[in-house]
Regions:
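ATP-dependent NMP and nucleoside kinases share a basic, alpha-helical "lid"
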Residues: 99-148
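Conserved nucleotide-sensing/catalytic segment adjacent to the nucleotide-binding pocket
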Residues: 51-111
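Receiver (REC) domain switch/active-site residues of two-component response regulators
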Residues: 56, 126, 183
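NTP-dependent small-molecule kinase module
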Residues: 1-19, 123, 131, 144-148, ...
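Conserved lysine of the Walker
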Residues: 36
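P-loop (Walker A) phosphate-binding loop of NTP-binding proteins
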Residues: 31
Length: 207
């Protein structure tokens, strides 16, 4: 389906009734470089009072895909209090200052990042999007971004990191298979003929 973004938003907000005082929690999952951050920015613009929780922050200095305990802590705090102030244990251990904060009054929280929709988090999510992008496209995007930002060193170091990352990512996805639990599967590339403000996704489920 190709629909305007408002149709997608209405569908996401209709999937589960959320109790008063708690934000709706929507996971945006997919390969590294698939377009998750771009989608999160789009949804944050069109859904009022939306905060974004990046798994890159939760997983900082944790072993790859072994940070489910940090994600669960964050989601349980959002369920219990409607807000979040969290210093992940690896931040303290490695001297990173500050906190991850979702302020009171936030009505929607987008959990954005590879692994956001992992099986362990499913009971705490209200909606789950999977951004589908081919491996080669995701790798090219991710490498271009990381080299430009210098987050994993120079070009040689970035390529080395991505080979390590994608091996761990494939192993995690082979076991967890998050797309099978997704409420929405969305195309992470711009398709020919897609109009401004349109998104390509699998469309609302029908009985």
């Amino acid at each position: 389906w190709a629909t305007d973004q408002d149709t997608l938003v209405r569908y996401l907000l209709s999937l589960r009734e959320v109790p008063p005082g708690r934000p709706r929690i929507i996971a945006i999952d997919g390969r590294g470089g698939s377009g998750k951050t771009t989608l999160a920015a789009l949804l944050q613009r069109v859904i009022p009072k939306t905060g974004v929780l990046h798994t890159d922050d939760l997983a900082w200095n944790e072993p790859l895909f072994q940070w489910d305990h940090v994600l669960i802590d964050a989601l349980e705090q959002l369920h219990a209090t409607g807000a979040l102030t969290l210093t992940p244990p690896a931040w303290r251990a490695h001297g990173r200052e500050g906190h991850i904060v979702i302020p009171p009054g936030t009505t929607t929280v987008l959990v954005e990042g590879t692994g956001a929709g992992m099986r362990a988090a499913t009971p705490l999510l209200d909606a789950h999007l999977w951004v589908q992008t081919a491996d080669d496209v995701a790798q090219e995007r991710g490498l271009r971004r990381d080299i430009a930002e210098g987050v994993n060193g120079d070009a040689v170091e970035s390529v080395r990191f991505w080979h390590h990352w994608m091996a761990a990512e494939r192993a995690f996805f082979a076991e967890d298979r998050p797309w099978e639990r997704a409420d929405v599967i969305l195309c992470g590339v711009t398709l020919p003929g897609l109009g401004a403000g349109e998104v390509a996704w699998n469309g609302p489920s029908t009985p």
